[in-house]
Amino acid sequence: MFPCLAHRPWQVLCRVYLQQRAPLSQRSSKISKPCFGWQSRGGVHKLWFSFPDFRVTSLTWTQVQNCSTSGSGKDGSPTRPEEPKTTEKAQAAQPAAKGAGSKPQGLTKAESIQVKVRAVLKKREYGLKYTQNNFITAVRAMNEFCLKPSDLEHLRKIRRRSPHDDTEAFTVFLRSDVEAKALEVWGSQEALARERDQRKEVEREYQENIFRNQKLLKEYKDFWGNTKPRSRKRATFLQGPGKVVMVAICINGLNFFFKLLAWVYTGSASMFSEAIHSLADTCNQALLALGISQSVRNPDAIHPYGFSNMRYIASLISGVGIFMMGAGLSWYHGIMGLLHPQPIESLLWAYCILAGSLVSEGATLLVAINEIKKSARTQGLSFYEYVMQSRDPSTNVVLLEDAAAVLGVVLAAGCMGLTSLTGNPYYDSLGSLGVGTLLGTVSAFLIYTNTEALLGRSIQAEHMQKLTEFLENDPAVRAIHDVKATDMGLSKVRFKAEVDFDGRVVTRSYLEKQDIEQILNEIQQVKTPEELENFMLKHGENIIDTLGAEVDRLEKELKQRNPEVRHVDLEIL
């Protein structure tokens, strides 16, 4: 703004005269207002620039008179003012200044400047910890601050949207009000802390008494008989995969008993491998039954997403058990048979038991195949896709174990037949090694598929695209980013996405529920920045609540259209 002074240090006091031009009807003498600043040594510099007059439609002229504190230049003689070049604005403003009689002698430059004043709200400093706007529920207020319901009656109550699907709104309190009430009731923070410790001790004793009473109640029911109807958990356990597992446990237990008798009678290594195979199947399927019973438990505070992964955990342990007990012992017995061959007795009973085992294992295999076909048809998958993706780990374990059992029976019968024909016991030992290899392959597949499921496997791409398109078709959504949809087991899906909402649509959704005339009247009554701030804070908070309601609406509609989606997390981008 001062090109002739930009290169000089500010060291000399300067005096500024402000002169305004009044309207023609109120033309008066000069009005001079001095102000002070610093300017460089030497010379007198005079500049003209104008400000808009907010009181009248005229220009305000300002004369800057620069005076040297010594009144001389470097050599002590008066220094003449330096005359900068005048601009077009200065040339246009000079005649007006002359007509007003306000141009002082020595004017060399005039500049017209428009100053725009910007009103800015003062920024509030909240600090590292700010809890004055935190809400707290009645249950938390009573538990954390040791208050009674009567203590909360006279506090400010605020209705907010509920985060739960079964309720639309619930009542909360300001945390600052609750803290103040707690200090009023207990007197100090130390007294409140002592009361909390006492209540924790009482709660611990209460939990111990509940556990003791539950044991007594169980003993009482066992003595007199439990007349309660069969629970939903037991009914669920006897359907679908639970039914398949229970059938497999019964059949494999009988097979183990008869194969063990045949091995004791014949001494066949292949028969020993088959007996161990049936024992491993029985133990693993009992473990699967435990996993199924635990997977249908309801979620609790420690496990908010439920226990559906217990099926995968049980199947994983089952795979490890098949490898250790089935494959390991079969290989060991086969190697010992090769190193130390033993004569084999009559194999007639062994053939009969193998034939019966083939029929029973085949029946269990058919039950597992039918159950998998039914489940795959329900989810729109092929039989192969359902098995490879391990959608139902318990049924998969039964299927693979029974398939391996049928193949193992055929392999053991073939090797025993070669031993009977040739009299060479090495064929029987090779049969034991073959059964062990078959069991090792099955266990490796089970370990791999269940590990993949426990790590968090994504759902099919077509299904994920369907969920994404449903959200993108909503008018309140601009775009969907960072979509993650994982299979939680038991046909449950967890969906997460970053949503870019259309602010105009959300705001219009809020305005459609308001009285526009009333809002217009509120706008017209705004006169000061404080009133404008209160107006924006009021409606801004309501718009944020509307945005939260839009998120809840999308989550609810997504669950209704896709029942397999149990948990939805939509993050505002």
Curated annotation (Swiss-Prot):
Principal location: mitochondrion
Motif LXXLL motif, chain ranges: 467-471
Keyword Mitochondrion recorded: yes
Transmembrane regions: 244-264, 319-339, 347-367, 397-417, 429-449
Region (Disordered): 66-108
SUPFAM superfamilies attached to this UniProt entry: Cation efflux protein transmembrane domain-like (SSF161111), Putative DNA-binding domain (SSF46955)
Gene Ontology molecular function: any one: zinc ion transmembrane transporter activity
Gene3D superfamilies recorded: Cation efflux protein transmembrane domain (1.20.1510.10), XPA C-terminal domain (3.90.530.10)
Keyword field: Antiport, Endoplasmic reticulum, Ion transport, Membrane, Mitochondrion, Nucleus, Transcription, Transcription regulation, Transmembrane, Transmembrane helix, Transport, Zinc, Zinc transport
Protein name, entry field: Proton-coupled zinc antiporter SLC30A9, mitochondrial
Native organism: Danio rerio
Gene coding for it: slc30a9
